[in-house]
Amino acid sequence: MTTTLSNALLSDILQQIRPLIGQGKVADYIPALAQVPANQLAMAVYTVDGELYQAGMADKRFSIQSISKVLSLTLALTRYDESEIWQRVGKEPSGLPFNSLIQLEMEKGLPRNPFINAGAIVITDMLQSRLSAPKQRMLEVIRALTNTADICYNTVVAKSEMEHLSRNAAIAYLMKSFDNFDNDVITVLETYFHYCSIEMSCVELVRCFSYLANQGICVGSKNQIITPRQARQINALMLTCGMYDGAGEFAFRIGIPGKSGVGGGIIAVVPDAFTVAVWSPELDKSGNSLAGCAALELLANKVGRSIF
């Protein structure tokens, strides 16, 4: 028997997953994220009919980190012919950690997909080439999608990531050695880290990504952001590549497209129905929110929603 969406349902789900707090580990390789209290939980759902449901700390902002990679790809799709994008980044799952250099070397500087670090850095390089102010443009896009004027970068987080850029710089320089990188590496990484440092709440995330549940149309503004075909393609990539090297497990357990970030957030999409965001800072071994994945599994089971 399926359950109807409601604030009470989301509150009940958060109550059920609360015992999981303490079983994961907050991201500690970015010092600013290591200081985030681990006991926070939030969840929000936004339907294609414009109904909003929320529970927990759903209005509290956090660092979205790799969730921003979906927005970078979306922005690139509005600035480039699709064939130009897929010449420089693939569409296949990686199966390796998100910051791996080994696969990149073996595959001659062509990242497996846009949702691992190498792929997102290439997409950022492309945006750097096409936009005069890529950091400002990203904020404009997000503020329009959420109808929220004060969404911003956390410059402390961005600075913290710049101070620990060695791994990502190695990725970028390796791609440059294979002629798959056009701009100054440090300039692109600064933009990339700013994108990762964007702070949004679960409520803002579900509004922001509503276009992926609604044939490419933003539910709030009714603006066509990308084509229905492009929305399907992004959802497909989220399903196969959106959860680091835990994507297969996520598809098996939950069965909807999702994209996580090491800030503990996850955005997930049920096409033609709703977007859902969860936040719990503690991560599992794959770098996905441990309690967040459990919350999404409960929601998918209770409302009987899956793409399969």
UniProtKB/Swiss-Prot annotation:
GO molecular function: glutaminase activity
Database matches in SUPFAM superfamilies: beta-lactamase/transpeptidase-like
GO BP terms, alphabetized: glutamate biosynthetic process; glutamine catabolic process
Domain of life: Bacteria
Sequence positions that bind substrate: S66, N117, E161, N168, Y192, Y244, V262
Broad class of enzyme this protein falls into: hydrolase
Any matching Pfam family: Glutaminase
Catalysed reaction equations from the record: L-glutamine + H2O = L-glutamate + NH4(+)
Enzyme Commission number(s): 3.5.1.2
Key words of the record: Hydrolase
Description of how the protein assembles with itself and partners: Homotetramer.
Entry's family note: Belongs to the glutaminase family.
Alphabetical list of HAMAP family matching this protein: Glutaminase
Protein name per its UniProtKB record: Glutaminase
Source organism of this protein record: Proteus mirabilis (strain HI4320)
